[in-house]
Regions:
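Active-site-proximal loop/helix of nucleotide/amide-processing enzymes and allied scaffolds
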Residues: 2, 6-31, 36-39, 49-52, ...
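Extended substrate/RNA-proximal surfaces in nucleic-acid metabolism proteins
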Residues: 45
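Mobile, glycine- and charge-enriched loop segments
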Residues: 50-56, 60-91
C-alpha cells in the first residue's frame, strides 16, 4: 500500500506500508511566538546597555517580575521575555524555563533582570543563589550569563555579579560567578 500526503508548507511525506494497520500520530513542535514588539537596544554586552530598557519594562511594576534578554554570539539582542510574575514580595523562577527559551533562540549570552518594589536594590540571598545556579548551568550549556540585575522605579540598578565580587573581595575570597 502506498500513501502520499501533502503538508501545508508544500513538502510531502510518503508512507509505504504492508498490510499492517496504521494510525495517525500528532507531531508537536515547540516554538516561541512573538506577542508584541518593543523598542530595544540593538546590542547588549553589559548592564548599562540594557538598564533603561529593563527598567521601563519591569521597574515600575506592582509585583516582582523576572525578565530574560537573549543575545546572539555578537551580543545582538534576539528576544526578551518575562519568565516569571510573582507577588509584591517574590517571584518564583524556574531555571529550566530560562534555558528552554535561550536554547530555542540559539542564544549565546543571556542577561537576567528582576525588579524590587521598594527602594532597596540589595540582592537577597535567594537572588544570589539563583544567579549563581543560572551561571553554573549556563556554563555547562555554553550560554554565558552576562549578569543578573535588580531594578526599581529609581534611577539606578544593582549588578548581582558586581555585588558578589565586592562581597567576596571584602571577605577575602576570589570565586566569581
Amino acid at each position: 500500500m502506498l500513501s502520499v500526503r501533502t503538508m501545508c508548507n508544500g513538502s510531502f511525506y510518503l508512507y509505504i506500508t504492508e498490510s499492517k494497520k496504521m494510525s495517525k500520530v500528532a507531531v508537536t513542535r515547540v516554538c516561541l511566538k512573538d506577542d508584541y514588539y518593543l523598542n530595544a537596544p540593538d546590542s547588549v554586552s553589559n548592564c548599562e546597555d540594557a538598564y533603561l530598557f529593563i527598567r521601563n519594562q519591569i521597574g515600575f511594576g506592582t509585583v516582582e517580575r523576572v525578565m530574560i534578554l537573549c543575545m546572539d554570539y555578537d551580543y545582538h539582542l534576539i528576544k526578551c521575555a518575562i519568565v516569571s510574575i510573582g507577588n509584591d514580595n517574590k517571584a518564583v523562577l524556574d531555571i529550566g524555563e530560562i534555558f528552554k527559551i535561550a536554547l530555542l533562540l540559539d542564544a549565546h549570552h543571556i542577561l537576567i533582570a528582576h525588579n524590587h518594589l521598594g527602594s532597596s536594590l540589595i540582592p537577597t540571598e535567594s537572588d544570589i543563589q539563583i544567579t549563581q545556579k543560572i551561571g553554573y548551568v549556563g556554563n555547562i550549556l555554553g550560554i554565558s550569563l552576562i549578569d543578573s540585575i535588580i531594578v526599581n522605579a529609581g534611577e539606578n540598578y544593582q549588578s548581582i555579579r558586581r555585588y558578589i565580587m565586592e562581597r567576596e573581595k571584602k571577605n577575602g575570597l576570589d570565586e566569581h560567578l
